[in-house]
Every structure is written in structure tokens, then in C-alpha cells.
Amino acid sequence: RDFDPNNPKDIAKLNTEVIISRYAEQCSNSDISFEADIRANTLEYLPAQDFTSIFCNLLDNAIDASLSCDEPYIDCNVSLIRGGNTGLISIANSCKSSPLGHDGKLHSRKKDTGFHGYGLKSVKRIADKYNGLSIMFTGGKAGIPRCGYAGASLENFPA
């Protein structure tokens, strides 16, 4: 079957391939291990602007955090859970230290904090729009911190 520019599934697949390819290349150029596992039929109903905002903001942050690590990596996974009506978008990456302060809130370690934080606010706004969750977690074993994001319910995506 040929690509159909009027088919939302074809558009979603193309958007996915373009964005993931862009970040895979950035990671390769920066010696960051990059893994992506995006299951079929998981993102076609997410509008392109929302998909792009979620992935670009999260992957930009993941690259930033991973650059200072001895063994930098990013794992990107998208799958369906709960009988296929809930999407799980998970981005996990290495990080030198937890981005969460003692108060449990994100704190910027960037020198220029003027525009810092808008990306994650955008991700949260999109998750809220679809009755999803935007969850930041940290953890790890063997002294390797791990940061990640998970969220988004597909139940209210436009058909």
C-alpha cells in the first residue's frame, strides 16, 4: 500500500519516523545509546502538533541530561495497555543526578533559566487534555541514576 497523505495512520507513522530518526542521529553524533520501541497503532490518533511537542520536549531534555553521563543512554517506548485504550509513552535516560529537589519538584540546572520549564509544562498540558498523567520518576541501580517520563491516556483522543 502506498502512502496516503489523507490517512491519519500514514501521517502518524511518518511523523514518528521523522522525529525518532532525528533524535537517533543526534544521539549517535553525541555517543548516546538510543533505543526506541514504538508499537504499531499506538499514536495515529494523537494530532501531529501534540505528538511533536511531547516527543521533542522530552527527547531534548533526555539528551541534555545524558550528555554529562559516563554511560549515556535514552530508552523511548510507546505501547498500549489496559485493553488497548491507554497509551504509555515512556522516555527514560541516564542522568548525573536527580532533577528533583528535596521538595520533590523539578529544579533547573541550566545556566539560562529564562525559558526553562516550558517544555515540560507543555507536555503536562497535553497529557491533561487527554485525561492522561505526566509523571516524572527517578531511580536506578548500581549507582546509575535514571530519569523518565510516562503518561497519556488514549481514551479521549480524537478519532
Residue spans of the language-model regions?
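Conserved ATP-binding N-box helix of the HATPase_c
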Residues: 48-72
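Short beta-strand/loop element within the Bergerat-fold HATPase_c
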Residues: 73-85
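Glycine-rich/acidic phosphate-handling loop/turn and adjacent ATP-lid/helix
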Residues: 87-117
